[in-house]
Amino acid sequence: LAAFVACGADTPASSVVPAAANVAAPASRPAAPVSTPALQQTEYTQALPSQPLPAMAAIPAAPAPQKQITAPSPQTTARAVRTAAPRPAAPAAPVFPVTVKDGNGDDIVFDSPPERIVAFDSAVVEILFAIGEGDRVVGTHEFVTSPPEANDVPRVGGAFNMDVEATVALEPDLVFLFFDRFKEDLERAGLRVLFIATLSDDFNKVADRIRLWGEIVGNPVSAEAVASDFEERVKTITTTMADYTAGPSVFQDEGALWTPGQGTLIQQVFDVLKLENIAFDVVGYEQISPELIVERDPGVIIASYGDSISGDPVFKDLLAVRNRSVYVPTSDALSIAGPRFVQGIEELARWVYPGLFP
């Protein structure tokens, strides 16, 4: 969980353990889209791990064949769905000055691109490298793991514990913070600071963050290409799922039964993929009880940092465990609100609905 938080993703709320006895059982849920392969299940029949279906679920009508969409691979740049009005072309050359409103509502004016950036945020590091401006990053924090090219960037703290002296020694002309704890100390040391809080309410805003950094560093053309690609891939997913009402129930374990609920980017992902979060009454992140998980019996489990549930006798009768429907992501893409976030959505979509997202 610590790694998840420090990567600049949603920040967990204080630990609250709901009592299972006080929670009403959820209503029965519709099944996943019928265009995915149907499975016949008895109580202890093993289903395909990539396609769990609750046995008691009703099946919605399939959409008209002409609406079927083939989802692209993460590497594809030409997308199957393009229904939005075209965005005006980005300027061919950078335009300065650039004014940015920071997290405190203050205007920060850039008369020229910063050359030496301490990017104390995983998402910003990924954005700068994605738009071809990674050589401007001269410092970051210890939890940055992507892209591999960033491994050689000096570390000046552990996400929430910045070494101000080490930061000053790097002689940056801009320090970016996703929280403002060290802002005054850095400014007293004569450094320019841009504070903007981590995205936590809408992953669609990632594209605008990418464009913002393109303006700041004077590379709007590359930023527009990356941002548009992000938006088109999200559009493909949302359009593919638009004709369906509900899929399987889901529990996401961020470690020690901490789980995301309302007001998180992960809940937004669940909404797009029509997954029914068993932690529907959680706000932010909370640690829930084993009893509540057993009571709500998820059809799918996402084990963000390794599967510690399947081998636990407490959870042996869960539908997801019996069907071997426990998904361990191959990366931390869904933990960081940067360009890779859409890859995390695509990977989860292919695992849950292989018939829709081949």
Predicted ranges, named:
Residues 1-5:
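Sec-dependent bacterial lipoprotein signal peptides
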Residues 143-146, 259-286:
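Alpha-helical, coiled-coil/dimerization segments enriched in small aliphatic residues
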Residues 107-109, 174, 182-258, 279-281, ...:
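Extracytoplasmic substrate-binding proteins
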Residues 181-188, 295, 300-319:
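A ligand-binding cleft/hinge motif common to bilobed small-molecule-binding domains
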Residues 162-171, 189, 288-297:
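Short helices/loops that flank or line small-molecule/ion binding pockets
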